[in-house]
UniProtKB/Swiss-Prot annotation:
Pathway: Pyrimidine metabolism; UMP biosynthesis via de novo pathway; UMP from orotate: step 1/2
Residues that, per the record, bind orotate: 133, 161
GO molecular function annotation: magnesium ion binding; orotate phosphoribosyltransferase activity
Record's protein name: Orotate phosphoribosyltransferase
Species of provenance: Prochlorococcus marinus (strain MIT 9515)
Subunit organization: Homodimer.
Keyword Glycosyltransferase: yes
């Protein structure tokens, strides 16, 4: 899987504990993809928690392609992720920008579909996601970024549900790198 520094290996273990405690549920759920599932992961209780966001941000920063000059994601799930990663990067002396991708282009003002600093064309941007199922949200973000002449090589996610997202992204020449897969939750005999 991913080879992390010793510190981030510990961060990853602590993050999994937090996700199991605050984000994972068993039951009958309809996912954003429209699929039914007996397992639900809502990472927002962890990504909107100071310690959780710190863990995610450190792990994403180490996992991210070093050629990336910005991170981006579709609002709302990616909002804390992109903010956390650029703040963590800044604390380490790294320059990284962030873009928030609107689900719908504004109907007023500048009619922007992207929010954030003005970046040069062909800037390499990494897309951040909380959970990837079919990768529909990530693909929407990638298309919007590519329409604006940015280069997207990868998507980083907290969890890959292993339901076709990896393959869908591969069709768009995008590498999916995930901190965890659904198996990590199932192997830990989560009883929620």
């Amino acid at each position: 899987m991913n080879n992390f520094s010793q510190e981030n290996n510990l961060n990853k273990k602590n993050l999994l504990k937090l996700l199991i405690e605050k984000s994972y549920k068993k039951g009958n759920f309809i996912l954003a993809s429209g699929k039914e599932s007996a397992h639900y992961l809502n990472c927002k209780p962890v990504s909107l928690n100071g310690k959780g966001l710190q863990l995610i941000s450190n792990l994403f920063l180490e996992l991210m392609d070093p050629s990336s000059k910005a991170v981006a994601g579709l609002t709302l799930g990616a909002d804390p992720l992109v903010s956390g990663v650029i703040l963590t990067a800044a604390s380490k002396g790294l320059l990284l920008d962030a873009l928030i991708i609107r689900k719908e282009t504004k109907e007023y003002g500048t009619k922007a579909g992207l929010e954030g600093p003005t970046l040069k064309e062909e800037t390499v941007v990494t897309v951040l996601e909380d959970v990837v199922t079919t990768a529909g949200s990530a693909i929407k973000a990638i298309k919007k970024l590519r329409e604006n002449n940015f280069i997207v090589k990868e998507v980083l996610s907290i969890v890959d549900r292993k339901e076709g997202g990896y393959e869908a992204l591969k069709e768009h020449n995008i590498q999916l790198k995930s901190l965890f897969s659904i198996e990590d939750f199932l192997m830990n005999n989560v009883q929620n």
